[in-house]
């Protein structure tokens, strides 16, 4: 499989020469194993000025952000246990047997209890890898249960745009920090790490995953991934239609050879961290012109979201 060959290439490179040396052969300016190519950085540098234009180059990303945020919030809420003894949680599919108004009351009380418990929990720290102009970073920083967000990206112009845009919202003061740096230069550990629409733009995705995992809180930290399966449907929707026909995605944004199947990521975790992780959720997602981004259960086709929890 392609992803495994890219992973194995990292191992082979380490045996023959360091990752820095390998990049130094190609260019004298990039020598981090989690770096993107010069072409990738240049491409996103050109997109930086229109990053926050909802009708501009990133309009599809703006629409997708709502679905990404829903996926993150739902996953986190699902980890909150209902501790109020006054709330009865049936041990069966109550929606099939109880009246609708009873089901609605049960659901409402459960949600209220979850929100209350979530607000009482210690606030979480977030690392947004490949934050670009800060679309997801800002949304995460506005959540009440998030203490702070650190956004990193290799494109300096995107970081400048992110910093300037964050100044427009007083709520974000002290809650968000942006830096132009490689992932392996980040210190500390985080409760949540997001790596969304990023893996398909790097040469060594295994290095990104490895460094993300090492910076994830061992006490049940969660890694959120969002990328694209490598298949004909993905090429047709994202490259042929998205970039060339509809032109709703800037041309040159995607490369089929860099797409990663969801099964390949799970296989990599099983090979490297067997028994040390738990798959919390895996959903496919697709863009419908008159509806926006929606989730579905075919996670091995097109775009997908993945949430992986670290276990002790």
UniProtKB/Swiss-Prot annotation:
It is a peripheral membrane protein. SUPFAM superfamilies: S-adenosyl-L-methionine-dependent methyltransferases (SSF53335). It comes from Saccharomyces cerevisiae (strain ATCC 204508 / S288c). The gene is COQ3. Pfam families: Methyltransf_23. Gene3D superfamilies: Vaccinia Virus protein VP39 (3.40.50.150). GO terms for molecular function: 3-demethylubiquinol 3-O-methyltransferase activity; 3-demethylubiquinone 3-O-methyltransferase activity; polyprenyldihydroxybenzoate methyltransferase activity. The keyword S-adenosyl-L-methionine applies. It is found in: Mitochondrion inner membrane. This is Ubiquinone biosynthesis O-methyltransferase, mitochondrial. GO terms for biological process: methylation; ubiquinone biosynthetic process. PANTHER family: METHYLTRANSFERASE (PTHR43464), UBIQUINONE BIOSYNTHESIS O-METHYLTRANSFERASE, MITOCHONDRIAL (PTHR43464:SF19). Its EC number is 2.1.1.64, 2.1.1.-, 2.1.1.114. O-methyltransferase required for two non-consecutive steps during ubiquinone biosynthesis. Catalyzes the 2 O-methylation of 3,4-dihydroxy-5-(all-trans-hexaprenyl)benzoic acid into 4-hydroxy-3-methoxy-5-(all-trans-hexaprenyl)benzoic acid. Also catalyzes the last step of ubiquinone biosynthesis by mediating methylation of 3-demethylubiquinone into ubiquinone. Also able to mediate the methylation of 3-demethylubiquinol-6 into ubiquinol-6.
